[in-house]
Amino acid sequence: MPNLSQIKKNTFWLILFQLAKMAFPFLILPILTRRLSVEVYGNLTYVKTVMNFLQIFVDFGFMLSATKELAKINHQKSDRTKFEQVITNTLFARILLGLLGLVIVLVLCIFIPILHQNLLFTLASYFAVFLSIFLFDFLFRGLEIIHIMTIRFILMKTVSFLLTIFFVQQDNQLLYIPLFDIFSSVLAIILVSFELKKLHLHFVRPSLKASLFSLKTSFIYFLSDFSATAFNAISTIVIGLVFSSTEVAFFGLSIQIIGATQSLLGQLSSGIYPEMVRQKSLKFINQVSQKTTPLVLLFTIAVIIFTPIGLQILAGDKYLPAASLIQILAITIFFSFCNTLLGWPTLGVINHQKQVTISTVASTFFNLFSLLTLLFFGQLTLHRVALIRVITELVLFCIRLYYFRKFRQEFNL
């Protein structure tokens, strides 16, 4: 299949995957915001935000590092044993991360009141995250058979979605939500096991040394993936320490809407990443940028304009106070897209992972320092947190744009 056709196919299935990833929460959102009290929905949003952070931790950049390694092995038609060893070591490394993640959850539950008060709900939610280790998304991405991953995800979420609609009617049934996620994840793991058998893949004895080395390799990818989630997670966690569950609900809803949009647009970068690994073409990345950034800018403006009416339809009148927060945070849509494009598909493929990591760490520290400064001086408000989120994304953009211009001569023409 020609490269362009493969890119289109990969991008189509990744976009469909992300559409489903965004659609299911949006479909369930108007139901839960109307059935649950604002306070309980705030608790739900807070726990979900923490779980999104932990999901990135458990993934630890393997969606890029392991995908890249498997794609190279597959392209070179290397020894199948080497292929299976990478899969096994990656799985073992992620299990270690999953166990460490459990320790992190328990520590957070001790110090964060919302998590402590919803302990069983928090632990059940994390177990659903832990089960994602066994879905092998990195494998299907590396083999460029993304349709398997997408179809499985849609089936899994459909089951969870339908169960939630029928059985979650009021506040005291909140625990059902992660239990349904666990049930659907188990079904998905069963489907994945059948696909592994079809591919005639087998697990070999894991190497602890190789697994730890893979963690070291993936760390820089993790830091990059961590950026958008870290910005959102840090902001929400700080708000949860200071503000009421109702205010957490307003901010969490805003982050959920904007974050889902950012993730959807970010799939373009995932779609072109394998091709950029092969070509390292400046012309190609410029073509993609010139065609997409004006559209993303127009989309961002549209979100800002139509937020009030959209929020009223989506969540109901009681969440209208969140409209101004969403309008501020919407500015990050454009810059987040540019940052994703300038990250691994651009700087990463010319072996400037260090610069991608530096930009991520620097902007994350800026975000955290700004929030803690406002907190220390008693000047923390929801709108100021949203504004800091925008400025942080702009800081990240400026750093990555500087590196792109500095190293642009290293691309192929």
What are these regions (language model features)?
Residues 6-63, 161, 220-245, 299-300, ...:
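Signature of the first transmembrane helix
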Residues 59-77, 258-281, 343-349:
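Helix-loop junctions and terminal segments of transmembrane helices
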Residues 10-25, 149, 155-160, 177-197, ...:
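Transmembrane helical elements of multi-pass membrane transporters/channels
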Residues 119, 129-152, 278, 333-361:
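Membrane-interface junctions at transmembrane-helix termini in multi-pass inner-membrane proteins
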Residues 9-21, 47, 52, 56, ...:
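Membrane-water interface segments that mark the loop-to-transmembrane alpha-helix transition
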Residues 109-125, 306-337, 379, 383:
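Interfacial segments at transmembrane-helix termini and the short loops linking adjacent helices
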Residues 126, 150-199, 255, 362-366, ...:
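Hydrophobic alpha-helical transmembrane segments
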Residues 41-45, 49, 245-256, 323-327, ...:
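Small-residue hotspots at the loop-to-helix junctions and early N-terminal turns
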